[in-house]
Regions:
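Conserved NAD+-utilizing ADP-ribose enzyme module
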Residues: 1-13, 28-30, 37-53, 59-150
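Contiguous, amphipathic alpha-helical segments that mediate oligomerization or scaffolding
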Residues: 17-22
Length: 150
């Protein structure tokens, strides 16, 4: 399997969230919004790649396109994350598996599919204490900046 290319530090990605991931009065989602789903885990196993949580390259995909591709009918909130911030967090906490990589959707010809990316390093390591893992997810969530509501 070819290695995925990591996005550069000047790039920005976004993630769609349903409102239940945003605590009342909070500026960013809670860390649970970044826990890889069973679908993320199954996809990684099938493809022989690291577990990836979906994010989108804002230069290639609009939030409306991402919402359509995912088939979301409910309102969503759009939060941006600067890749530079992810790289700095990775260095600070020494989580070398953390990266934002290109992962275009090839099974669809829908507009914006080429902007699909994966946020790696968010799955819990075998011997990682739950409190340390929760702190990691909360720190990632704090990198988010609200961009829109759709």
């Amino acid at each position: 399997m070819p290695q995925a290319s990591e996005l550069g530090p000047d790039e920005v990605v976004f993630r769609l969230f349903r409102e239940h991931f945003i605590p009342d009065g909070q500026k960013y989602p809670n860390g649970e919004a970044f826990i890889p789903s069973s679908i993320d885990q199954d996809d990684a196993k099938k493809r022989g790649i690291p577990v990836r949580v979906t994010v989108w390259d804002q230069a290639l995909t609009t939030p409306s396109q991402a919402k359509f591709i995912w088939g979301f009918n409910q309102p969503v909130m759009v939060f941006k994350i600067r890749v530079r911030d992810v790289i700095q967090l990775r260095a600070r906490i020494q989580r070398l598996s953390m990266a934002v990589v290109r992962d275009p959707l090839i099974a669809t010809d829908k507009a914006g599919a080429e902007g699909h990316c994966g946020f790696e390093g968010l799955d819990r390591n075998k011997d990682e204490p739950r409190t340390k893992y929760k702190t990691l997810l909360d720190e990632v969530a704090q990198l988010c900046h609200e961009s829109a509501r759709l």
